[in-house]
Design a protein with these regions (language model features):
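Extracellular loop-to-transmembrane helix junctions
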Residues: 4, 123, 587-619, 866-878, ...
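Generic detector of multi-pass transmembrane helix bundles and their immediately adjacent loops
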Residues: 331, 347, 359-523
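Extracellular/periplasmic helix-exit of transmembrane alpha-helices
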Residues: 337, 763-793, 848-861
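Membrane-interface interhelical connector segments
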Residues: 337-355, 776-804
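Hydrophobic, membrane-embedded alpha-helices of multi-pass small-molecule transporters
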Residues: 572-591, 602-614, 633-643, 665-672, ...
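Membrane-water interface regions at transmembrane-helix termini and the short interhelical loops
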Residues: 594-595, 617-623, 647-653, 670-691, ...
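Hydrophobic transmembrane alpha-helices that form the core helical bundles
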Residues: 622-658, 678, 812-834
């Protein structure tokens, strides 16, 4: 038991510290205090600083008649090595007319006693070398010392990694000694371009860290940023890799890690070959590498030691396991409580009978079962291995069997929980994220059904898409999309095809470089031997920073720095097209029009009229927007955001919706949209590009379920009214105007034909896809009682009673992106008009809700006509401004 005096300083330091310096100042003084010429003075000072520590060995010796002292730390060096390599040669040394400085100089220059021979100059250097396993020689009359590297402390041998098992790979793992780990890497990578730099971190622990990289492949910018982060890291002690990772990940709001850890030397060598940077830390067997992509959580070493078809099968199993582990309990709770129509009658009856005798609600029951599992798992981990496994098995069997037998827990719920927990073991790198968000999905599913699960899923997706590691998005190569790198993401091609051609152009191992989206420099890094193929053509990129936010101060008041940095970036044309397509799809999903040949012709005519309206905006997109134009654009985006809210809740009125209070549901949706806005335009753009294929697959499944019940002649049936009336109605719906206006706002001021061509191509593709959807799928929409694709009472793709909840998920995901885009642009217009306003985006969200409430109160459900006039004015104003400027110049002339 420690005494009350255990944590206090020694008495000889109390007065000095209390009068002149703090503990930190004392540490700095010791580090900087130089050695003295007298041996007795140095020895007494060392004893004073050491405070009588028992493991400091002081051995007085005489070398060539000079009084010397050999200092070492017990247990940190090899006794046989120091006796044979240091003491015996020193005892045999006879140097005539020897002095202390000359003796140390002769030993250092003429005698090879050890390979590593640092020269301590201060008392801090002496203690640092002694504690690192060196033997330090002090000589009388010398104001410096000489150290010999004779380390020989006990260490764990090289063993098989415990956290990363494999079948056909190597069975060597890192140890706790950094120099041993360096040798494991060097033995596999004998290239001269492999650089391993040692440095010391930690004010108290003085831990050795090793920075590893391939000098011909690493990005100089990435390497410099990592070095700066390590230099700014102020830690007293470093005991594991978990101490360093937060400083390399920079932000705490990220859900997923941007740095990876591995216990395997072969895995780390493959990362170094990809141009990554690795960090070895003394005292831990886990090496850090960065940056890390999200898809790497589903890749293992065994994927490259088996046939490609089996690797693809296993990889898809991992993707499926991730979604099951994360979503299965929440979806089960949501369906059982809010969407029982998704189940067929037999399954619904079984679940009803199982839950009939349960004393708690299903949400409480689900959370209780998961909490019980987490307690048992934690107990099994913390207990000794001989007892932990037995305790886990016994506790699981006894508690689980007793709970089911007594009726506290239903059998289906226990089955769902066991399946979710088991699938979570397939992806151990994501175990922490899965564990926490599994509970959150249960809460959201129990409170708001699949609507709540969709909102929480959007929060995770937006956070994932906004996460970058030193400018590299971790969602690459999915967003931004890189076709070459996709060959080893969802599939896995053969190794012969991977290594065909230039080995530096590895399709997947360099996916993070192919998809570089540097923070502020999109063309990124063009190094002579690294990342020269990562440059992305800039002709198809649309610049946001030089448009609406052109005259904002460098860092607007109230605008988060992350948002400002994202505003100054560029987004890719494919992501822009995904946003426009989802906006158009949302408008089409919510359109309550009986589609027919007349309606198809009306849509074509309406698209032509809208193109004429947008023509002035396209022609004047390179002109700096004036404040009146920004005000009109802001009004349009607020109006359209409110209209999207009304469309969403109009759809909700026709399907089974778990949130009955529209205002509360709108507040939830607005909160998620504002979160996406705060993360920046890149988060929205990447999320849209990831949602687009998901939306296509879901829509195909739903339409296949309804296709057999549709009559093809409905497409040619008259819907009532003339072609002009159909065009007028479609024009009032403002079909693709939001996407077109959004494209125009991202046009750079410096006009480029390639940029205008990309804009027109995206507009044409969006309109063409929409019209083809009407023409091909219109026969399905002609028979439904709800809006076009809302086939809740019509489609039964999985033999369900009704499929309303699936449409709720689709509408929520697409509606979140659509409304978030409008809020972002409305907030940007507000920031343009009022640069000193602290919360422009929150004002945009509140304004959108007020507009939606006002339109609902006034019955203005089709407000697109107002948007037409506003956009028309937005095109006329710059033209008038330009003409007025030319007239003034002529008058001045």
């Amino acid at each position: 038991m420690l005494s009350p005096e255990a944590g206090r300083l020694r008495p000889e330091y109390t007065e000095r510290i209390g009068n002149t310096m703090s503990r930190k100042d004392l540490q700095q003084t010791i580090e900087q205090e130089p050695l003295r010429p007298g041996l007795e003075a140095n020895l007494s000072r060392i004893k004073e600083i050491g405070g009588g520590t028992s493991d400091l060995l002081i051995n007085p010796v005489r070398v060539s008649g000079i009084p010397c002292v050999l200092l070492c730390c017990e247990g940190m060096l090899s006794t046989a090595t120091i006796t044979e390599l240091v003491l015996h040669p020193l005892m045999k040394l006879h140097l005539p007319d020897a002095t202390g400085p000359r003796l140390l100089e002769h030993i250092n220059d003429e005698m090879l006693l050890s390979v590593d021979r640092p020269v301590p100059l201060t008392f801090g250097d002496v203690f640092r070398t002694i504690n690192s396993g060196f033997a330090v020689l002090l000589a009388d009359g010398a104001n410096h010392a000489l150290a010999f590297g004779v380390q020989g402390y006990d260490k764990r041998g090289i063993d098989e990694p415990s956290s990363e098992g494999n079948v056909m790979g190597a069975h060597e793992g890192f140890t706790e000694v950094v120099r041993t780990n360096m040798s494991l890497i060097r033995r596999r990578m004998k290239s001269p371009v492999l650089v391993q730099q040692l440095f010391v971190m930690g004010e108290k622990s003085r831990t050795d860290l090793c920075l590893c990289y391939m000098s011909d492949r690493v990005s100089p910018r990435l390497l410099e940023q990592i070095r700066q982060d390590l230099e700014h890291m102020q830690l007293e002690t470093i005991l594991s890799s978990g101490y360093v990772r937060p400083f390399l990940e920079r932000r705490d709001w990220r859900i997923f890690h941007t740095t990876g850890t591995t216990e395997r030397p072969d895995v780390l060598c493959s990362k170094l070959l990809e141009g990554r940077v690795a960090l070895l830390i003394d005292g831990t067997p886990f090496a850090i590498f960065l940056p890390k992509l999200f898809v790497e959580n589903f890749q293992t070493l065994d994927d490259y030691t088996c046939k490609p078809y089996y690797a693809v099968f296993v990889r898809w199993i991992k993707y499926l396991a991730f979604f099951l582990a994360l979503l299965l309990p929440g979806i089960y709770t949501a369906i059982a409580l809010h969407h029982p129509e998704l189940l067929n009658s037999t399954l619904l009856q079984l679940l009803t009978e199982a839950e009939a005798n349960a004393p708690f609600s299903l949400m409480t029951e689900s959370i209780g079962v998961l909490l019980m599992y987490e307690v048992i798992r934690e107990a099994g981990i913390r207990l000794p291995k001989a007892v932990g496994g037995a305790v886990s098995i016994v506790a699981g069997l006894i508690i689980g069997d007793a709970a089911v037998s007594s009726g506290f827990i239903s059998t289906p719920l226990l089955t769902v929980t066991a399946l979710s927990v088991t699938t979570g073991f397939v992806i151990p790198e994501l175990s922490h994220e899965i564990t926490v968000f599994r509970f959150l999905f249960i809460l959201c599913g129990g409170l708001w059904g699949l609507f709540g699960i969709s909102l929480l899923g959007m929060v995770m997706l937006l956070n994932l898409c906004a996460t970058e590691a030193y400018g590299y998005p971790i969602t690459a190569p999915l967003a931004p999309f890189a076709p070459r790198a996709m060959r080893d993401v969802l599939t896995r091609i053969g190794l012969r095809r991977m290594q065909t051609g230039n080995p530096r152009r590895h399709p997947t191992k360099h996916a993070w470089r192919l998809c570089t989206v540097s923070a502020g420099i999109f063309s990124a890094i063009s190094h002579r031997n690294s990342l020269q193929y990562a440059s992305i053509p800039a002709s198809f990129l649309c610049n946001l920073s030089k448009n609406l936010l052109a005259h904002l101060p460098h860092k607007p008041c109230g605008m988060p720095p992350a948002l400002w940095r994202n505003c100054m970036n560029k987004i890719r044309s494919g992501q822009l097209f995904a946003i426009c397509f989802l906006i158009r799809s949302f408008s089409l999903l919510c359109t309550d029009i009986p589609f027919s040949a007349v309606q198809l012709g009306g849509a074509v005519l309406s698209a032509t009229l809208q193109g004429l309206i947008l023509l002035p905006i396209l022609l004047t997109a390179g002109i700096e927007p004036s404040k009146p134009a920004s005000c009109l654009f802001g009004a349009f985006f607020l109006l359209w955001g409110g209209h999207c809210f009304l469309q969403l809740w109009g759809v909700a009125a026709g399907v089974t919706f778990p949130v009955h209070n529209k205002l509360f549901g709108a507040l939830l949706l607005t909160g998620v949209c504002l979160y996406g806005v705060q993360l920046g335009i890149h988060a929205l753009a990447r999320s849209a590009s990831l949602l687009l294929p998901l939306f296509g697959v879901a829509l195909a499944v739903l339409l296949l379920g309804a296709w057999s019940k549709a009559q093809p002649e409905n497409l040619y049936a008259a819907a009532g009214g003339s072609l002009l009336s159909a065009a007028w109605k479609d024009l009032c719906e403002c079909g693709w105007l939001p996407g077109a206006a959004y494209l125009c706002r991202f046009t750079p001021f410096r006009p480029r034909r390639a940029v205008y061509g990309a804009l027109l191509a995206q507009l044409g593709a969006t309109v063409l896809v929409s019209l083809l959807g009407i023409a091909v799928l219109g026969r399905v929409g002609a028979q439904v009682e709800f809006p076009f694709f809302t086939l809740g009472a019509f489609s039964q793709p999985f033999a369900t009673q009704r499929a309303d909840a699936i449409y709720v998920v689709l509408f929520t995901l697409i509606g979140t992106i659509t409304i978030a885009v409008q809020l972002y642009l409305a907030g940007a217009c507000i920031a343009r008009l009022f640069p000193k306003f602290p919360y422009p985006f929150y004002a945009g969200g509140a304004g959108t809700l007020l507009v939606a409430w006002g339109m609902h109160s006034l019955g203005l459900l089709h407000s697109g006509l107002f948007g037409v006039w506003i956009l028309l004015l937005c095109g006329i104003l710059p033209v008038g401004q330009q003409l007025w400027g030319q007239l003034r110049k002529r008058r001045m002339a």
